[in-house]
Amino acid sequence: MKSRIPTLLFVLAISFSTTGFSQDDDATSKSNLQTYTPSKLLNRGQWDINWFHNLSTEPKFADGNGKSISKARENYFTSTVEAFTGISDNNRFNIGVIVEMRSNTNNDRKALSVFEFDGDKNTARSGITSFAPTIKFQPFKNIGNFSIQTAFHIPLVKNETENGVYLDQTAWTLQNRFFYDYSFENKDWQLFAELNTEYNFGDDTSFANNTFVFSPGIFLSYFPNSDFTILGLAQHSQRFGDFTQDYTALGFGAKYQISNILNLETIYTNFVRGTDNGLGQTFNIGLRALF
C-alpha cells in the first residue's frame, strides 16, 4: 500500500479520559488507560514511549472506479517507535521523535513472509525508512482534552521501488494531527476523534509528491473496568493533488493495563472500500510505557 496513513493512524495509543479532564488534574485516581489519552499532554520530565507493530496484507486492489480486483498478495509490516517527554511547567508542550522501520514483500508471498528478512531482492525489502522530530501542544488552556501534534517526517529511503518492490515514500511529509476526546456521563463509554492532515513534498519522483491528505477517524470505547477497554473504529482517508486515492476502514480492538507503567494494545482493521488503493486487512499490536 503506497500510503503512510494506515500505520500512523493505528500507532495512536487509543486510551481515553473523562470529560473536561484538565492538564492539572490529579491523575493518580485513574488508570493510565483513562487518563493519558492522545489528547492529554505529559508533565515536565514525564516520558511516554510507544512501540507499535502494524502488518497490512493486501490480496485485492480498488481501481480508479472503486472496483475490487484480485492481485498477487502484497504485505507491509511497519514497526514504529514514538518517544515523547514533557518540557513545560504548565503541561501544555511536549517534544518527541518518531522512527519507522519497514519490511515489505510482494509476488503473492504469505503475510508472515515480512518477518523472514531473507533479502530476496525481487520480492522483499526492509530497513529504517524515516524519522520525524515532533511537537505536541495544548492550544487552549481551558480545554485539556484537545491537542495538536505536528511532525516533520524525513525520508531515509533513496528509491521508493526497487525490482518492483515498494518500501516507503521518498517525499518529505509535514503532518498535523488534531486530537479530541469526550466521556459520556456514566464514564463507561468514551469517544475519541482524530483529524490527520499531511502535505507531501520535496521529491518529484515520489508518488506522494505534491499531495495533500485529509483523514478523519473516530473511536468508540467501552470500559468494563479501569484497566481494560474494548473499542470500535471507523476511518476515512482522502489523498488529493498530483496523485489521488482514498479508502475507508473499519475495525475493533482492545487495550489492557499490565502494570502502572505498561499498557498492551491490539487492533484489527479491514479496508472495506477504496479508489486506487490496496484492499485488505491490518493486524496491530503495541506496547506503551509511561513513567
Give the label of every model feature segment.
Residues 23-200, 211-290:
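Transmembrane beta-barrel domains of Gram-negative outer membranes and organellar outer membranes
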Residues 1-31:
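Cleavable N-terminal export/targeting peptides
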